[in-house]
């Protein structure tokens, strides 16, 4: 499972490209949060990767147009619970997270609340100076 917020998609894209180049067909989920649909980076490439990989991309918009039919709001515990594997299948599942600090903190806290082992999630933190 990959969780990205905004430009935090960049390191996730590198991992997805590598998996595609290797012909990996494990089931993958990407939860990708942005403010608006227009702010979603790599849309076309993500569509291609969905075809090349066994990848489901879930877009989560915090300020979508009224006609948006996808997920709304922020990536929180309830949303993670909907898209993470069942608890009995989580022991072999890893979660990779990259995005703004508040999002990453909230996702990590939610994962702990969902009994995902701290050793099973990996965060890529960066700051703009």
Residues of each region from the PLM?
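FNR/FR-type flavoprotein reductase catalytic core
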Residues: 1-129
């Amino acid at each position: 499972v990959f969780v990205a917020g905004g430009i935090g998609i960049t390191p996730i894209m590198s991992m997805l490209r590598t998996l595609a180049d290797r012909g990996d067909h494990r089931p993958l989920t990407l939860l990708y949060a942005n403010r608006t649909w227009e702010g979603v980076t790599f849309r076309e490439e993500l569509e291609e990767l969905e075809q090349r990989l066994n990848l489901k991309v879930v877009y989560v918009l915090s300020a979508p147009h009224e006609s948006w039919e996808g997920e709304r709001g922020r990536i929180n515990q309830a949303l993670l619970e909907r898209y993470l594997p069942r608890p009995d299948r989580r022991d072999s599942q890893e979660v990779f997270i990259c995005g703004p600090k508040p999002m990453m903190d909230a996702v990590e806290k939610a994962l702990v609340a969902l009994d995902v082992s701290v050793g099973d999630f990996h965060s890529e933190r960066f700051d703009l100076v």
